[in-house]
């Protein structure tokens, strides 16, 4: 299953880039690691089509999908009822902070207590235990923040630590959902680059509904 393959990737110290750090005695492998560009968080408004089709696909076996893509919508509402909305996406590159943590470091590094924040994430996979802990800490000290997380896949969902982290998110008021086919279509329309002069319709992959139901059942079992 997907969680087993992702678990193997996450076991390495540089978990997000999938490199096998146990082979550092290999000169070629060492050179490859040294030549990696420095860690950075990629941000933008719309992500390339091929990134969406590969990274967001809700497959059960997620080999090779060792990055996190996070599309976000932030609605900020004043006491007078006026609201402003911004949106974009984050992609984590190589080792370092994951996209969830980077969101709070770069997109919303501070919160105005006089405003209300409604944040929606569309994420390629559910948070790891460490990212869930960061989310919990932010929610606990930011009472004017409401967070909805929609995920394509569940990351390492059989691990007790991850299950406990997801339960704590629910208990803290964070809403966690598996993406429905309609959610993928929403991402396609609002966060994916379109060819200039034309807007192609979203084409669901063959097992999109089946895999949604699979992950929805797993998440319900975890959160019950």
Swiss-Prot record:
Region of interest (Disordered), residue spans: 1-23
Protein name stated in the entry: C->U-editing enzyme APOBEC-2
Tissue: Expressed exclusively in heart and skeletal muscle.
One record GO biological process: cytidine to uridine editing
Secretion signal span: none
Residues of the active site: 100
Organism: Mus musculus
Role according to the record: Probable C to U editing enzyme whose physiological substrate is not yet known. Does not display detectable apoB mRNA editing. Has a low intrinsic cytidine deaminase activity. May play a role in the epigenetic regulation of gene expression through the process of active DNA demethylation.
